[in-house]
A protein has these predicted regions:
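Positively charged
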Residues: 1-137
Length: 137
């Protein structure tokens, strides 16, 4: 189900709790909402749809939403400076990101996974993990 986007900086600045199997439907809604906004958005975190739970969805290289539950960056290299926009905020803001990252997360079956990402996909994952931590760029 496509949900409304939260734009309150106060709500977005609150850290998220860890996701459980009871939160799988939120991940589905998050993927649906990202797909509905894919013309101007490459990733979303659950707090952007009003859920304070650590779930992100990022468009993969094929343009499909990849949902990650409880993502955590476990390796990174190649820091760089960039400017990022956000669907829930106006304008672009400076950010420091890593060119390449490895992320541990759980999939939609709550199985542990590890993935390596680079480029825009890595940048989007870092941005959405910041959302889970209550960091608003």
């Amino acid at each position: 189900m496509v949900r409304d986007i939260v734009r309150s900086r106060i709500l977005l600045a609150r850290p998220s709790r860890q996701a459980t199997a009871d939160d799988l439907a939120i991940g589905t809604d998050l993927a649906d909402t990202l797909a509905a906004h894919s013309d101007g958005c490459v990733g979303m975190a659950a707090n952007m749809i009003g859920e304070r739970v650590c779930i992100i969805a990022v468009l993969d290289r094929n343009g499909r939403p990849r949902v990650m539950y409880n993502p955590s960056i476990v390796w990174h290299e190649g820091p760089y400076q960039t400017e990022e926009g956000c669907l829930c905020l106006e304008g672009a803001r400076p950010a420091t990101r890593w060119r390449r990252i490895a992320v541990e997360y759980q999939d939609s079956s709550m199985r542990a996974r590890t993935g390596r990402f680079e480029g825009l996909e890595a940048e989007a994952i870092q941005h959405e993990i910041d959302h889970c931590d209550g960091v608003v760029i």
